Amino acid sequence: MRSRETVTYSLVFLLILSIFSGIYGPEKVLELDEKNDVKIESISKSNNLIDIPSWKLNDKWNYNGYLDMVDFIVDSGVNTNLQTLTGTLESTVTDIYITTVDNSSSLVYKVESEGYYEANNINLDGQPGDLEVNMDTVSIIRASDLATVSQEATIDINFCRDFLWFCIDVSVGTLEVDQSYSPPLEGYDFPISVGEAWSQDYTATTTYSGSSDYVDIPEDTVSQRTANYEVVSQGFSGVNYASCATSYNISSSNADGEDTGYKWFLSLIHI
């Protein structure tokens, strides 16, 4: 029979996997460093349309935010008071080059990110402690429309279990997830304007690797998916940055109409 600790760490691993296996993008609530430097190439002169930004090498975004765990916990049935993981993410454009995307030569950006997320004083299946997640990601973004070609993430998961007046640091596991999209995932449809909606059918190919003493690494998958997007509003994003008053909220859902998230797009920077 597996020990209670083993069950707890297995649940931690599976919860983190459920979040990161499909989406690695920035969180729902973000703050940006005002040192961002992004050039805009305008296609339209209309004040009501936002066009494709042109990134430069070493462009950088700093995020503060959270990962919402509630829906995943409810679906899993895990007994825990964990609701969110809070932390930071720094993204940098590290390369710009031409590669083949769906049999066509395309200019792409390579964006590398480093993130750290934590939840302190939580209880997982009767085990109190702190949950820590370190994440490194690499995203390949098509320059012509900011569509995501592929994403890969390396995720280190640690649970510091409370014991008397100190805690025991347990390495729950390391997970590597590589995901590619065909055609590339079009989270934007430029030029952007309120009320615009679009859908996309695509194939997601996901490969897993890594190690854990508590749970098996998942099998690779190939799945057919549908993504629906809508620009639902324009206004203040909640981020304390000079240009955020004119942000565009882009919401997304799956083929069943279930909300899968939202993001903000700004005329000078995007989040």
Residue ranges of model-derived segments:
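Short, cysteine-centered beta-strand-loop-beta hairpins and adjacent loop/turn segments enriched
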Residues: 68-79, 116-130, 207-215, 253-258
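Sec-dependent N-terminal signal peptides of Gram-positive bacterial secreted proteins and lipoproteins
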Residues: 9-20
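A structural signal for short, hydrophobic beta-strand segments that form beta-sheets
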Residues: 90-101, 148-150, 226-231
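Short helix-loop boundary/capping segments
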Residues: 150-258
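Conserved small/polar residues in nucleotide/adenosyl-binding loops
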Residues: 269-271
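N-terminal Sec-pathway targeting helices
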Residues: 2-10
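N-terminal cleavable signal peptides for secretion/export
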Residues: 15, 27-114, 119-120, 200-201
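Amphipathic hydrophobic-ligand
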Residues: 78-94, 127-135, 171-183, 219-228
